[in-house]
């Protein structure tokens, strides 16, 4: 019997659970899969227990070891891929490497504790890496007798979210008990269903990669006698068609405009190339020496070259093959963006003397050449070809 075909008719959304250690992120993940399997039995909705989610396999993403559990489930209207990172360090690494791009997240806060240090850090990281839609799940309400206390905790969470520029007064807060729902208490199961209905309604359907403006990182350039210059690479987002006007952005002082005269894949002519395709793009009016690896081909005006930005970075530990010693202000490694290395200097935040292997930190970077970057662009930090860190652009400065 063939496996059931993957159903593309439902919109797909990436979601995750975030919050302080032991506030119930993994229990909630187990509860969502279990309650949906009971209430909406489909081939996708299979119950996952706490132990199987908690024993997340190790993955390596850009040289960094991360434990993450991936589960899937569906509601009447959507298909969800859900990530749960068991450890705090795993969560930070996931966010910073872009290993887990979330369209929205469920912030789990234990009603018995209220917001804790990692609650704050996860909210800040969500803000920095561009997770714009948070839903709050106040967990463990069965352990709190005092209604006023729940109100105070909710106010405290809303204030904290507002402090980090989330719409604290307006975003949804749902009070429940993941453990009670998991144990089959129907009152608490109803609350899990309400949480999923809220996710369906509050987290907007993500824009598909093909609908975004074209971005094609240039990997290779060659010229075809009599036809012109070909740039090849994998289309990161958007689409490219013959006769499109494009810009060549980064590395050089000036952004150059050109027109696409051909799109090829596997030596065949195409009408258009889509996000994910490896293509060769024939460009009219571009000399072989006017385009190079490390630049990007982009929809005009959609992305600009920059030399200064702030980034959230994770520095690999010694065990992950990173540095054995700390680095200090004005450290000058290479920053690897998409297809190329560019040297840059690092300025540490005020009051931070040094950064140890295994730390995460906000840095200001100044590159020696401009590169096409925007908020959310990921990069690696390298020394002599060896990855020593990983980061994501949180703010453009110049």
From Swiss-Prot:
Residues in the signal sequence: none
Identify the species of origin: Streptococcus uberis (strain ATCC BAA-854 / 0140J)
Read off the Pfam families from this record.
Answer: GTP_EFTU, GTP_EFTU_D2, GTP_EFTU_D3
Q: Which residues bind Mg(2+)?
A: 26
Q: Which residues form the tr-type G domain?
A: 10-207
Matching CDD domains: EF_Tu (cd01884), EFTU_II (cd03697), EFTU_III (cd03707)
What protein name does the entry list? Elongation factor Tu
NCBIfam families given in the database record: EF-Tu (TIGR00485), PRK00049.1 (NF000766), PRK12735.1 (NF009372), PRK12736.1 (NF009373), small_GTP (TIGR00231)
Organism placement in taxonomy: Bacteria, Bacillati, Bacillota, Bacilli, Lactobacillales
Q: Give the UniProt family note.
A: Belongs to the TRAFAC class translation factor GTPase superfamily. Classic translation factor GTPase family. EF-Tu/EF-1A subfamily.
The segments labelled G5 in the record are: 177-179
The segments labelled G1 in the record are: 19-26
Q: Which GO terms describe its cellular component?
A: cytosol
């Amino acid at each position: 019997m063939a496996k059931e075909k993957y159903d593309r008719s439902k919109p797909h959304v990436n979601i995750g659970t975030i919050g302080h250690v032991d506030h119930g992120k993994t229990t909630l993940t187990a509860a969502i899969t279990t309650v949906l399997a009971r209430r909406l039995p489909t081939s996708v909705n299979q119950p996952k227990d706490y132990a199987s989610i908690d024993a997340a396999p190790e993955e390596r993403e850009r040289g960094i070891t991360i434990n993450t559990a991936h589960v899937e489930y569906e509601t009447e209207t959507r298909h969800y891929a859900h990530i749960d990172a068991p450890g705090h360090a795993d969560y930070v690494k996931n966010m910073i490497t872009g290993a887990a791009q979330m369209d929205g997240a469920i912030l789990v806060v234990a009603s018995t504790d209220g917001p804790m240090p990692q609650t704050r850090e996860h909210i800040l990281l969500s803000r920095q890496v561009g997770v714009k839609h948070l839903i709050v799940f106040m967990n463990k309400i069965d352990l709190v007798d005092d209604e006023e206390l729940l109100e105070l905790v909710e106010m405290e969470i809303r204030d904290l979210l507002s402090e980090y520029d989330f719409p604290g007064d307006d975003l949804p807060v749902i009070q429940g008990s993941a453990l009670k729902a998991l144990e089959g208490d129907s009152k608490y199961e109803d609350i899990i269903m309400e949480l999923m209905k809220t996710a369906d309604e509050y987290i907007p359907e993500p824009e598909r990669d093909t609908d975004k403006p074209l971005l094609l990182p240039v990997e290779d350039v060659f010229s075809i006698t009599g036809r012109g210059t070909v740039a090849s690479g994998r289309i990161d987002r958007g689409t490219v068609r013959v006769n499109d006007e494009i810009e060549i952005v980064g590395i050089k002082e000036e952004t150059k405009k050109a027109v696409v005269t051909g799109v090829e894949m596997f030596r065949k002519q195409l009408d258009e190339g889509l996000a994910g395709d490896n293509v060769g793009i024939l460009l009219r009016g571009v000399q072989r020496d006017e385009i190079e690896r490390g630049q990007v081909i982009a929809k005009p005006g959609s992305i600009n070259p920059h030399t200064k930005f702030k980034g959230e970075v994770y520095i690999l530990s010694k065990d992950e093959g990173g540095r054995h010693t700390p680095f200090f202000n004005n450290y000058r490694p290479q920053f690897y963006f998409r297809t190329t290395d560019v040297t840059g200097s690092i300025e540490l935040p005020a009051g931070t003397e040094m950064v140890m292997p295994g730390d995460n930190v906000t840095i200001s970077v100044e590159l020696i050449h401009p590169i096409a970057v925007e908020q959310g662009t990921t990069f690696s930090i390298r020394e002599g070809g060896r990855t020593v860190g990983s980061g994501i652009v949180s703010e453009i400065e110049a």
